[in-house]
Amino acid sequence: VIVDNKAGASGTIGGKAVQTSPADGNTLLFSAATHVLAKQVLATPPYDPVTDFTAVARTGEAPLLIVIPPTAPQKNLREVIDAAKGGNNWNAAIPALGAPSHLATLLLAKQGNVKITMTPYRGTAPALADVAGGHVQVLMDSIISLQGMARAGKVKPIAVTSTQRSGVAPDVPTAVESGFPGMVYNSWYGVWAPKGTPPDRVLALNKAINKATAGLARAGAFTALGILPVLESTEQFRQFVAKDVARSAELLKEAGFKAE
């Protein structure tokens, strides 16, 4: 397996490379949930992320970690929402438009019935640095990306967005525990092939990826990162994507988001 990291433009640079590859199952796209929202967040997306690809397999999902500056006086998510309602100008760092961090922040504003200004960044690293420095009030992103800084005390973790506490951050309560029952949002990861890839090839890839995922899960590789392994058929993956896109599109519409 040759890995070619093609980042940028909300994931569409790598996506375009795969979309225009031969539909033989030899070139695949591995991406986070950001991939399926290109049509919603980009004014001129280079493709339709759902109809121009063949869903192969979903491999895992991980909760988002909500962090605030280490010097912030708030101790939990409820206090953060109350402070935001108190007339303070609260800014949330957004590492990428259409990413789980963006959609989860919209969901938090909805669940908390509060206005939060979205501040876009070019990736998680600069967003995390500004939260650590107290320049931005809140950030949520995959627990994989934020847990290192949280453990080091560079940022203060206040909640995770899963239904249960994460094994890699057992002392951090869920947003549900903090009084926000609808604040459940996971980042997820999947594999796609170009449209037109033969069904038998897609099925073989799905079985192989599920087998590899199960093996990594048994070895503890997923648990160590806070990822929950997912073993699904291609049809289950397609149905999941349809529901996720609908949910995200609704959040963007309610927020008055305009594609850029």
Residue ranges and their predicted role:
Residues S10, G14, A33, L37, ...:
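Stable alpha-helical elements in mature extracytoplasmic
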Residues V1-T51, N88-N91, L97, K110-S142, ...:
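N-terminal (or domain-start) structured segment
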Residues K110-Q111, E177, P199-E260:
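An extracytoplasmic/periplasmic, membrane-proximal ligand-sensing/linker region
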Residues T34-T44, L107-Q111, V138-V172:
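A ligand-binding cleft/hinge motif common to bilobed small-molecule-binding domains
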Residues A32-T34, A72, A96-G98, T161-Q164:
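Short, flexible active-site-adjacent loop segments at beta-strand->alpha-helix junctions, enriched
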Residues T20-N26, Q40-P126, A175-E177, W188-A221:
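Hinge/capping helix and adjacent helix->loop/strand transition within the periplasmic-binding protein
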